[in-house]
Amino acid sequence: MNAQLRAALRVSLVAKPPAEACADWLASAHDRPITVWDAWYEGPAILPLGRLFDAIRITADTVHAAADATTHGGVTDLLSRLHGPVISDPWRNRYYALVPPQTTETWRTGYAQCLGRGAWLGVPVPALDTQHGPHWRVQMPWPGALCQPRDVADLVQVGHLRLTAAAQ
């Protein structure tokens, strides 16, 4: 991407603080942060997991059951209680809660997968207002703010129990 386009992307983020600082922090997960900025101009950037953060992949069915809702507002309300960033991927019917690195070493909840070192995740640019394709369901409030694994595990457990009860 040329410098003028990159500058335009940064200007759009500056209008939504602390989005630019969060974008810089996320981009620093990559060996070449400039390539992340280039990718964001086109769509989500592919970032390595395990350095700055891991991601817990949760099915949409599990999240919707935990929220006891399928409406945008009901699901967002539940996910915002994780107090950290959550990406929605409607193409794959999944959510990704960003959690501290090395969560993979202690994650014991079998109903959602924790992705870490060696895995990559499509991450949209912060403050992007779209619901087409991967997008932030809950924005990162400040650089380095992550969901607590215990809170995510509780959400997954509630969703799993509700799905199991509904199937019986």
Give the location of each predicted region.
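Histidine-centered, metal-coordinating catalytic motifs and their short helical/loop contexts
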Residues: 94
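Signature for HUH/AEP ssDNA processing cores
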Residues: 1-91, 101-105, 114-116, 128, ...
